[in-house]
């Protein structure tokens, strides 16, 4: 006689018939190991397409726009760069933008003592704000600190504008447009100029 003739394996699982998936686990169990909804994009368009469409779900577009504005601010006139950094601060942290802008500007522009000093002040202020934000999450502090940091950054950019203006005034004149020949004042005509004493009136 076959073993299956007197033993039905489905009898041991009769209790599972009609039980829904949501009844098998508690809410805590589902949160611990069940897949989260919205964690990954459905593979409806293929793997490569999902990589491109995923930027709309992970704030990558926001970061990309902020970086584009920041790069344009680096190569724009100082006054326009203030506006671009201000817009970028809504997309990226202002502290990171200020630190990077000050470092890059000093690397390829250089500057005098005032510009270097203001860049150091802006960087130190941004680092302090970042450090305090680690221990506190006060929105009032963030607003006040960002206003102070933006004022310092504005003063730094205005120093750069003033420095560029002085450089434009003190542009050296090319040698081909300058006169390098020696010049001495005096009579340039190599002839004798008659005077009343040199006139001979005896002949008349």
From Swiss-Prot:
Belongs to the orthopoxvirus OPG144 family. Residues 88-139 are intravirion. Homodimer; disulfide-linked. Interacts (via N-terminus) with OPG125 scaffold; this interaction helps OPG125 to associate with membranes. Interacts with OPG140. Interacts with OPG154; this interaction allows OPG154 to be anchored in the mature virion (MV) membrane. Part of a complex composed of OPG144, OPG153 and OPG154. The modification Phosphotyrosine is found at residue 204. The record marks 16-17, 186-187 as: Cleavage. Residues 1-16, 186-204 form a propeptide. GO terms for cellular component: membrane; viral envelope; virion membrane. Disulfide bonds join 102-122. InterPro entries: Poxvirus_OPG144. It is found in: Virion membrane. This is Virion membrane protein OPG144 precursor. It is a multi-pass membrane protein. Residues 1-38 are annotated as: Binding to OPG125 scaffold protein. The 23 kDa precursor is cleaved into a final 21 kDa form by the OPG083 protease during virus maturation. GO terms for molecular function: ATP binding; DNA binding; helicase activity; hydrolase activity. The gene is OPG144.
